[in-house]
Amino acid sequence: MPEGHTLHRLARLHQRRYGRAPVRVGSPQGRFTEGAALVDGHVLRNAEAYGKHLFHHYSHPAGGGRVVHIHLGLYGTFSEFSTEDIPDPVGQVRMRMIGAEYGTDLRGPTRCEVIDEAEVGDVVARLGPDPLRADADPARAWQRITKSRKAIGALLMDQSVLAGVGNVYRSELLFRHRIDPFRPG
């Protein structure tokens, strides 16, 4: 499963390639057709990551904006291409987004849905601080960890404690600091 840093990289890439301009959004597979229609032709205002969640914020003429919420899960991937040579969709492309110069295909996500800004807040409220965000509050994570008797390895994987950490970072962090993953928080 991609860890938080991968989603932050994707958010920066999508912001750079598609941000502040109208994009075409479709669903060759058909499972996201209704959601794609809600944002197709709209301006991608901002792409941001929070933990393992990716949010594409779109402007909307009626106001309020719409957001495509993506969680890649175990199998989700994005593949990029140039609009000079747009390939036919291969495999189960849930969402295809095409900008002026680049396009991207999303395959196999756990979640790909259109939500509103309030629902973004609901998703984020269930998560712990994301250490890669400037607005992260590390004291919040520290408080949850130190008050728990759960194993530190399990706490680091708990997205409500610390958002974005996966098995690779958990293992490396504990190994480098010589902390037993079964030690209580």
Residue ranges and their predicted role:
Residues 1-185:
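Structured catalytic/nucleic-acid-binding cores of DNA maintenance enzymes
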